[in-house]
């Protein structure tokens, strides 16, 4: 084995361990998979869902709990879709899988004008079909392949174009409460997944339902974030971390926090806000200062000088 091959193998092992560690941590943090679960892994044929299936299968062998994996792909009847690729790949893995056939292509093409983005309607139709199929096969969790970068991009998409502070949660109870959606790749970086897919040589199937048309808004957000990351390394991770530490009282949503019902309560001991240093710098106000009286007002120039000297 040459030195280059040895180094390449070492780098791949590090990458695989990092991805498995990130997926394992996300699963543990959000209790995504429990003992006895039947996890329906949605496989699109893209790099992310392939990686998700591969990593979950690896974790399944080492996990202290027992859970089943069922791979599901939705054949949307796009012209030229290579129907043989996924069945051949999944047969080689020896796992249970289903190909769900639904002609959403015709529906999307009949509703969306030529040249317009089809992603929104396509995803809604696909989601409805997959939710129903999950119930049919008794799946207790639906695993989707969205990663950390997808989540942050969605946050800014909703802010910039929808006026909502909303992203993609790592774990979600569907509106009708009949399905739980999990995103095991929530802590994974897209660049890692791209390299992993390249090294594993997954048989990638491009989405050509809309002629490989890019979602221009998402691409603009992606470029913006990449620019930030280049200038300020670690920026995307910091933004993602902020989604895990939300202070509802510091925002402005009256449904999320009861601003209207705020009242004063001075029965408890005053909280130390760390202003002892300010108390030491500023001399106490004269006793004559009360109400609208200005007799005890301090000279602002002297106060500023005192602060500067301190």
Swiss-Prot record:
[4Fe-4S] cluster binds at residues 119, 122, 210. Pathway: tRNA modification. Its cofactor is Mg(2+); [4Fe-4S] cluster. It holds the Pfam family ATP_bind_3. Binds 1 [4Fe-4S] cluster per subunit. The cluster is chelated by three Cys residues, the fourth Fe has a free coordination site that may bind a sulfur atom transferred from the persulfide of IscS. It catalyses: cytidine(32) in tRNA + S-sulfanyl-L-cysteinyl-[cysteine desulfurase] + AH2 + ATP = 2-thiocytidine(32) in tRNA + L-cysteinyl-[cysteine desulfurase] + A + AMP + diphosphate + H(+). One of its GO terms (cellular component) is cytoplasm. SUPFAM superfamilies: Adenine nucleotide alpha hydrolases-like. CDD domains: TtcA-like. GO terms for molecular function: 4 iron, 4 sulfur cluster binding; ATP binding; magnesium ion binding; sulfurtransferase activity; tRNA binding. A motif (PP-loop motif) lies at residues 44-49. It is found in: Cytoplasm. The thiolation reaction likely consists of two steps: a first activation step by ATP to form an adenylated intermediate of the target base of tRNA, and a second nucleophilic substitution step of the sulfur (S) atom supplied by the hydrosulfide attached to the Fe-S cluster. Catalyzes the ATP-dependent 2-thiolation of cytidine in position 32 of tRNA, to form 2-thiocytidine (s(2)C32). The sulfur atoms are provided by the cysteine/cysteine desulfurase (IscS) system. Homodimer. This is tRNA-cytidine(32) 2-sulfurtransferase.
